[in-house]
Amino acid sequence: MTVQPSDPPTAEPVIRVDGVGIRFRRNRRGRRSFKDLFADSSRRSRPGEFWALHDVSFEVRPGEAIGVVGRNGQGKSTLLKLVAEVILPDTGSVEVEGGVAPLIEITGGFVADLTVRDNVYLTAGLHGMTKAEIDARFDEIIEFAEIAAFVDTPYKHLSSGMKVRIAFAVISRLEEPVILVDEVLAVGDKAFREKCYRRIEEMLADGRTLFLVSHNERDLRRFCSRGLYLDKGALVFDGPLTEALSRYNSDHPPRPAA
């Protein structure tokens, strides 16, 4: 891995990733046995298993804005899920100081049969907000999502764009020090995307830490100064974003338009 020198640290890391590895199985019918849970995690992979991430290490300090780049299937989303503690590593460790606002698989935590109102209270509550805090922010959440006419509509009847709007509006109101954003800015209309951009800029201005996974270089350059380049599950470059993108584009040149 290439690590570029950086300025001397001014604060303790908010994220420590040390020697992290995680295995998956290509054959979904395959299941790990109970015995596998206690097996040596460093053992050789079984047939059908592969390392989605292997021996990944880095630290992140408060206020850093990090773009994660790489081809599809190289471990970018898996890395964010590890930081969010949605999944656990097979090897190594992930330490996160404080909470995480996860804008990953953004509509996954919502309940189809509940109304928008109930989903706002449920999702925000699961992320640690009190009822009083949700009461105080409810109107601004709905106003941001621009769905006031659908507050008492079951979530399953919303369009896909509306679902993304309400999910972003809720998660972006969490007062967590770390923000994880995985391709969610690729959906929705142009005006709402710009609204999301401004909200992320507000969060960064508050000193939050950002992880952004995106194939849109313009988005990465807008928000991020540091880049992590993942390839075949390995962290092959950690340094300035411009150099991470240059390395990535050199290794995998864009295909010419047909």
Regions found by a protein language model. Give the residues of each.
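H-loop/switch region of ABC-family ATPase nucleotide-binding domains
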Residues: 214-215
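Conserved ABC ATPase "signature" region
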Residues: 34-41, 121, 133-150, 167-169
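Conserved catalytic segment of ABC-fold P-loop ATPases
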Residues: 222-229
